[in-house]
Curated annotation (Swiss-Prot):
Molecular function per GO: rRNA binding; structural constituent of ribosome; tRNA binding
UniProt keywords, alphabetically: Methylation, Ribonucleoprotein, Ribosomal protein, RNA-binding, rRNA-binding, tRNA-binding
Residues annotated with 3-methylthioaspartic acid modification: 89
A biological process from GO: translation
Gene: rpsL
GO CC terms in record: small ribosomal subunit
Span list, region Disordered: 106-125
Family: Belongs to the universal ribosomal protein uS12 family.
Organism: Variovorax paradoxus (strain S110)
Quaternary context: Part of the 30S ribosomal subunit. Contacts proteins S8 and S17. May interact with IF1 in the 30S initiation complex.
The name this protein goes by in its record: Small ribosomal subunit protein uS12
InterPro entries, sorted: NA-bd_OB-fold, Ribosomal_uS12, Ribosomal_uS12_bac
Pfam families referenced in this protein's UniProt entry, alphabetically: Ribosom_S12_S23
UniProt key word Ribonucleoprotein: yes
Xref: Gene3D superfamilies: Nucleic acid-binding proteins
Amino acid sequence: MPTINQLVRQGRTVEKINSKSPAMQNSPQRRGVCTRVYTTTPKKPNSALRKVAKVRLTNGFEVISYIGGEGHNLQEHSVVLVRGGRVKDLPGVRYHIVRGSLDLQGVKDRKQSRSKYGAKRPKKA
């Protein structure tokens, strides 16, 4: 417990909280251009080929972001919308690409959780 005199001399230090998605700069989403679209393998207990893209954002940051859902139409120079949110089993992937926005199409034939994958409501038969 410091004395009043010690507090007057030094004051309290405020703990700095580091952002989990610094490239967003406090924005909910950012637009960017794909510089590389590729697959990568997850950390130890899991096994798959996860689809990721390296994206150059409008603020100059270059980030690796995850492409969720089954199948995609992304290639180099595609314009995408990036949101925060990491992928636990892919080190260095701290962002997601928003499906159904800009150049990235929604997931085809998706029936459940459609809003997360940019899928339109299916037509009644």
